[in-house]
Amino acid sequence: MNGEVIIKAVRPDDAEELLEIYAPYVLKTAITFEYQVPTAEEFHARISDTLKKYAYIKAVLDGETVGYAYVGTFHDRPAYDWAVETTVYVKENCRKCGVGKKLYTALEQCMKEQGILNMNACIAYADEDDGHLNSNSLDFHNHMGYRTVGRFYKCGYKFSRWYDMVWAEKIIGEHMENQPPVRTFFEALPDIRKKYNICL
């Protein structure tokens, strides 16, 4: 992989190019338990909804989007505001080239500026590679400093078989008695631009 990977903020109008990356995961893998590829309109709405509060970023190489990452609400109740669920997808021909690491590093930086403390990953898991799922995602999260905190057995059904779900967690901030409120992505954006080399 030649050239420099640049991290940029996603806009809702990026829906179609991100969907091109996501669709093979839906159709070929159990990495996502989604059965149907969403429409561009639905994906546009998902991006818009995420950006109301959280970071949604993409990796661009030589003008082409090669991956994206974002976080979502861990739980709706306000007590969970400082925890998020993370997601990352990389284009098929760019996997194991450092794109995922760059995206997750940038995402973590954004989360720190927003005031997030706990980053949680919900990872589909199978004990053996079955052609639809292997241990790469869990291995990646372990490499990025996440630790496994739970496993749900045979809770997801896809491709006529059952898959486990592993929860992994990374603590990125200090838990205090009087915790400052979380900022939205756009409230934190000036500080993100100032501190980190992210072209947002």
Where are these regions (language model features)?
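Glycine-rich phosphate/pyrophosphate-binding loop shared by adenosine-nucleotide-utilizing enzymes
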Residues: G3-V5, E64-Y68, Y163
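A short beta-loop-alpha structural element at the N-terminal edge
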Residues: E4-L18
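Conserved GNAT-fold acetyl-CoA-binding loop/helix
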Residues: L19-R46
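Acetyl-CoA-dependent GNAT
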Residues: V37-A83, T87-N93, C110, I171-E174
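A short, internal acetyl-CoA/4′-phosphopantetheine-binding micro-motif in the GNAT/acyltransferase core
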Residues: T87-R95, I123-E128
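Conserved acetyl-CoA-binding loop-helix of GNAT-fold acetyltransferases
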Residues: K96-K112, S135-D139
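Conserved GNAT acetyl-CoA-binding A-motif
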Residues: M111-N136
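Conserved catalytic-core motifs of GNAT/GCN5-like acyltransferases
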Residues: C122-A124, L138, N142-R161, G173-E174, ...
